Amino acid sequence: MVDLTVAGVPEHFNYPWYVTLKNKEYIKNNINLRWKDFPGGSGAMCKALRTGEVDIAIVLTEGIIKDIAAGNPSKIVQTYIETPLIWGIHVSATSSFQKKEDLEHATIAISRFGSGSHLMAIVNAHQQGWNIEKLQFKVVGNLQGGIDALVNGEADYFMWEHFTTKPFVDNGIFRRIGDCPTPWPCFVVAVRDEVLATNFKDVQTVLKIINT
């Protein structure tokens, strides 16, 4: 039995993994696949790939490309979701900001540096024509940290997946003032180089199951 650990955010995108695990489809192929939730997002998963805490990650395209370029010993083996990810731009419900163009000098809540919330804030700033070097960030760890930072006034806006944050918009915690879709496929599957070298066929089996 081969042990493999897969990382992903606890969001609807990864429901197929929960279903295939529940159905014991990996065990039937002599693979003990374990799922690990990463509420901290892509930055946390990139770190986990580096340390060997996980073997496979369902990770944001922009996050893993940046980290591989910075030395992460992993490879992208396939696209997981081809459509763009829609990043909502959120402020506190009581904020004076009314549109995303107002946010040039505002403090941005991010889960961590190198995360999707960090990189997409840069993409949004670039699209708005702002000076990237002058962006101000507040590291908050995860979605709950973003909620707390906006409610407590520690940051001015927070970018997170549109539909994941919709309940917080609906109940009046956040106010969404814009969206910023990624100009690339949103999620890819990344695997540590060591795992590809030693368990390539098992990785192929995992991908075949999740793609079916």
Region spans (language model):
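Short, glycine-/small- and polar/acidic-enriched structural segments
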Residues: 2-130, 137-140, 156-162, 175-181
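Short, surface-exposed acidic
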Residues: 132-135, 200-201
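Pocket-lining segment of extracytoplasmic ligand-binding domains
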Residues: 144-212
